[in-house]
């Protein structure tokens, strides 16, 4: 007997869970289909375990780089990788349990398996047929790999979280935030780390101040940066080590190589053709601002649409979709402009709005006013490992409306959220000037710039 639902989500990641729970709250009969652990990339091989590892790297840096100058005897003989991984796993298990409890409370049927479209209203899962009035595709994405000889000897970001031990020498290939974060974590935990980027610097899409400062810190503290580095091949040596060969003849031998060159949509195994759902040339599902596909009753949110690939974006889009479909809000949709972003690098980065070059291109040089601040983070200022903290406000027009906020330095990851609200509300430089600073903090620089 075919089972029918009001709403089905294919994919138990951030977007699917958020949307299906919101729909269930409005009395819809819902099902969630997921073949792996709940939580998708973010919880299992992304944001959550990455942040745990970032904290671990911070602790090691505090002990070895900063502790002695604060007067602490920091002689430590051992770092236990297994203990760290066990603690991380236990934390993720608690998140899985939380998801299961909420879905159960909302009477959502969780179906373990892979879904494939039979037609626009019908899915096949584990040999059984189910139908729905509304179907959400939230299958997410997966790491990309280069097409070069020996690519199989490397791992990707998923594989990093399965490492049984910390390698002594690691190469990370990629210039985006995932590559920067992984390289920073591995370097912070004490491995000899190399970061290979195709052009002159990592994070080239960020404001130049961010990229330039990050390169400055990397040159001082690691990881070792290799620019204009285009991989040609990977060779596995007799001792188990790997040699990454570059097109220009350079090479580096390491114990572990991590591909972090980008991600691609995971849409290819659900038989989209049977439903008639359109994808673009890169395989991303084409949606409008309401998350509608070209087929009525089929929607998509998250990384498989090619939108901003961040967990809160998928969550927000999924919830707004359910509000529109099931709570009588016909115009509800996510505004994809001015989405704040944090990179958990060393030091962390926060950014929202337009970069300085983007603002100058959009508004013209004569309409743009930029305010900057550069100082040494207090946390490091009393030590021999001093680290820069740099901030920038990008303003436009006679009223100096703030259209971009950018920073790199200690605490930037936690301070950006509130400033993003201000930018989203249309704050001006005068609004910031009229806000009394909190002292002594790094955040006060944003309201005291001249």
From Swiss-Prot:
Highest taxon listed in the record's lineage: Bacteria
Catalytic activity annotation: 2 glutathione + NADP(+) = glutathione disulfide + NADPH + H(+)
The protein's enzyme class: oxidoreductase
Cofactors (names): FAD
Protein name according to UniProt: Glutathione reductase
Residue numbers annotated as active site: 439
Additional note from the record: The active site is a redox-active disulfide bond.
InterPro entries, per database record: FAD/NAD-bd_sf, FAD/NAD-binding_dom, FAD/NAD-linked_Rdtase_dimer_sf, Glutathione_Rdtase_euk/bac, GSHR/TRXR-like, Pyr_nuc-diS_OxRdtase, Pyr_nucl-diS_OxRdtase_dimer, Pyr_OxRdtase_I_AS
Chain residues that bind FAD: 14-15, 34, 41-42, 50, 115, 303, 311, 439
Subcellular location: Cytoplasm
GO CC annotation: cytosol; membrane
Binding site for NADP(+): 175, 178, 181, 198, 204, 262, 309, 342
Pfam families documented for this protein: Pyr_redox_2 (PF07992), Pyr_redox_dim (PF02852)
Recorded effect of pH on activity: Optimum pH is 7.5.
Its EC number(s): 1.8.1.7
Functional note: Catalyzes the reduction of glutathione disulfide (GSSG) to reduced glutathione (GSH). Constitutes the major mechanism to maintain a high GSH:GSSG ratio in the cytosol.
GO biological process: cell redox homeostasis; cellular response to oxidative stress; glutathione metabolic process
Binding site for glutathione: 14, 99, 319
Keywords: Cytoplasm, Disulfide bond, FAD, Flavoprotein, NADP, Oxidoreductase, Redox-active center
Membership in a protein family: Belongs to the class-I pyridine nucleotide-disulfide oxidoreductase family.
Chief subcellular location: cytoplasm
Organism annotation: Escherichia coli (strain K12)
